[in-house]
Structure formats: C-alpha cells, structure tokens
From Swiss-Prot:
EC number(s) on file: 4.2.1.10
Protein family according to the UniProt entry: Belongs to the type-II 3-dehydroquinase family.
Top class in the EC scheme: lyase
InterPro entries registered for this protein in UniProt: DHquinase_II, DHquinase_II_CS, DHquinase_II_sf
Quaternary structure (record): Homododecamer.
Active site: 23 (proton acceptor), 100 (proton donor)
Keyword vocabulary terms for this entry: Amino-acid biosynthesis, Aromatic amino acid biosynthesis, Lyase
Name of the protein described by the UniProt record: 3-dehydroquinate dehydratase
Residues that bind substrate: 74, 80, 87, 101-102, 111
Keyword Lyase: yes
Xref: Gene3D superfamilies: Dehydroquinase, class II
Site-annotated residues for Transition state stabilizer: 18
Short name of any one Pfam family annotated for the protein: DHquinase_II
Amino acid sequence: METIMVINGPNLNRLGKREPDIYGRETLSDLHERLIKFAEARGYKADCRQSNHEGDIIDWIHEAEGRSSGVILNPGAFTHYSYAIRDAIASISVPVIEVHLSNVHARESFRHTSVTAPVTKGQIVGLGVIGYELAMLALLEGEKK
C-alpha cells in the first residue's frame, strides 16, 4: 500500500486548545484519525507525525524519499524562516504540498511570507482541516498520471 506522509510542525500538538477561533476545535489526534481514514478509503496509508523540533521535521522529510508517494507538510511558524526545512524539501524527489489551517495571508504581516512554499508542489491555506484532504487528493491524482 502506498503511503502519504503527513508532517505537522510546532504547536500543532495544541490543536483544539490553541486559538480555536483560528485553528478550530478538532485536536491533532482527531485530524490524524480523519486523515488515516481518508487515505484508507482511497487505498493509501497516511503516516501522520508531529514535532515541535526542526531537526525531526527535516529527518522525516528526508525519510519520505523512498518510503512515501508524497508529503503533506504544515511547517507551522517554520514556514516563515526555516531555510533548513526548505532545503530538505528541495533535496527530495517526492512531491510536497504545504498546508495551513488558517489563511496566513489574512493574518499578521510576518505570516505572509513562506520560504518553504517555492520548493513545494503547491500550497493550500485557510481551509481548515479540509485543506489536508485536498492536499491528499492532489497527491493521489498525481500518482495516477
């Protein structure tokens, strides 16, 4: 069974508790369970992970090559300044789609810039947890072509 790796970055372990008016009430565990079921219904496996540590995220991106058909990445605040994560994305051959629960472009100005998005297949922002499902569909469609 093909695998899609889902990587969530810093503070996403606080989903459901942290600013629910922005990020929603669904917990990270709820999100992971939802994505696992979503993938299985389409004949795929979702490998869901979360870390508050940049090095873990980099290691997982590297690990995705050879193990996964694609990566869904929510780098959290690392989006705005982690050239190390950007370089990790650029170093692998599997497609990466960046996802953000909130519309980062409608928030504080420092959130408007993504150093990681230019090396991804695409970016989905502001659609809540459905954004992850849309990213998965995009990766699965890419597999069919």
